[in-house]
């Protein structure tokens, strides 16, 4: 629903969130970057018991305080259930952002945050997070094929998650369908995430009522509805007004974008459809659909 992807209005996004809530979903994840606070704020009027997780690019007290305030104002609450540092990479990035982590821990002690965490595509970061006692939750990229893991294989990430769990850290996965690459075998991919003893929860992007119904049914043990979702592949559109500035290529952690003959070109085999390239584009010519 984000402006980075489908670009839904707050009313359209809220309708999806309320439908999911009515089907029993009680946890939602967003980010400062995604631009979906208005959608969530509207949905919370009819779905008040949602547990809300968000994340932001913050590195010190000032940036963390500003991002937390944006979340409070954005969703209309004075409490965030889970606040995370967005896209952490390693021990070194965690050390470089430690001031923000300490600030968030103080906010938890004051009752403004339920838990502090980090999101990452790196197994090394999952391991490094165990060295920071204020980190209680990790949001790692993990799926059946290991698509999108930046520094190793699925097995490397599983080993890192196992280590984090030994430290009592909660785990909720991202991209169980590998950004859409596993859509042709979506039932097996989702079954892996649901049945894994390493994962406490799974965050799934859903853009339609059918997707919500099929995924909820799968979590209840009925995978039969997944078949009808296989004909909905995702893609990135680069519009004609692309100037070839290269900012999208610089932003892409998957190295899935290059500038060729003055225009951004996407390697779909590497892309995980996160949409972050769209945010980096100064001409607003990239969209995930």
Explain the meaning of each model-derived region.
Residues 1-11, 53-62, 182-184:
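Active-site mouth loops of central-metabolism enzymes
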Residues 1-50:
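N-terminal binding-site loop/beta-alpha segment at the start of enzyme catalytic domains
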Residues 4-7, 18, 22, 59-172, ...:
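Glycine/proline-rich, positively charged
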Residues 21-22, 105-108, 132, 166-227, ...:
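Conserved short secondary-structure transition element at the edge of the structured enzyme core
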Residues 26-31, 53-54, 114-117, 173-174, ...:
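Short catalytic-loop micro-motif centered on adjacent basic/acidic residues
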Residues 28, 40, 52, 71, ...:
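Conserved, mostly hydrophobic/aromatic
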Residues 49-54, 135-143, 222-229:
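Short hydrophobic/aromatic-enriched beta-strand-loop microsegments
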Residues 226-244, 255-273, 287-289:
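Ferredoxin-like iron-sulfur electron-transfer modules
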């Amino acid at each position: 629903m984000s402006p980075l992807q489908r670009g839904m209005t707050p009313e359209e996004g809220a309708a999806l969130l309320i439908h999911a809530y009515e089907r029993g979903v009680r946890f939602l994840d967003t980010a400062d970057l995604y631009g979906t606070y208005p959608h969530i704020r509207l949905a919370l009027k009819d779905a008040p018991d949602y547990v809300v997780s968000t994340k932001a690019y913050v590195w010190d007290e000032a940036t963390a305080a500003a991002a937390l305030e944006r979340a409070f104002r954005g969703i209309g609450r004075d409490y965030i259930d889970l606040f995370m540092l967005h896209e952490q990479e390693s021990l070194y990035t965690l050390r470089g952002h430690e001031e923000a982590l300490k600030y968030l821990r103080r906010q938890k002690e004051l009752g403004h945050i339920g838990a502090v965490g980090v999101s990452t595509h790196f197994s090394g970061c999952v391991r490094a997070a165990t060295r920071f006692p204020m980190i209680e939750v990790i949001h790692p990229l993990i799926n059946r094929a290991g698509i999108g893991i930046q520094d190793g294989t699925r097995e490397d990430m599983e080993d890192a998650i196992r280590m984090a769990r030994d430290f009592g850290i909660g785990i909720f996965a991202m991209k169980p369908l590998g950004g859409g690459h596993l859509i042709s075998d979506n039932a097996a991919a989702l079954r892996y995430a649901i049945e894994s003893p390493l994962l406490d929860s799974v965050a799934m992007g859903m853009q339609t009522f059918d997707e919500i119904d099929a995924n909820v049914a799968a979590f209840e043990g009925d995978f039969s509805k997944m078949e009808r979702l296989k004909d909905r592949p995702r893609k990135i559109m680069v519009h004609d007004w692309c100037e070839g500035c290269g900012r999208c290529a610089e932003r892409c952690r998957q190295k899935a974008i290059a500038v060729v003959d003055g225009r951004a070109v996407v390697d779909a085999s590497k892309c995980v459809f996160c949409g972050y390239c769209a945010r980096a584009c100064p001409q607003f010519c990239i969209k995930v659909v």
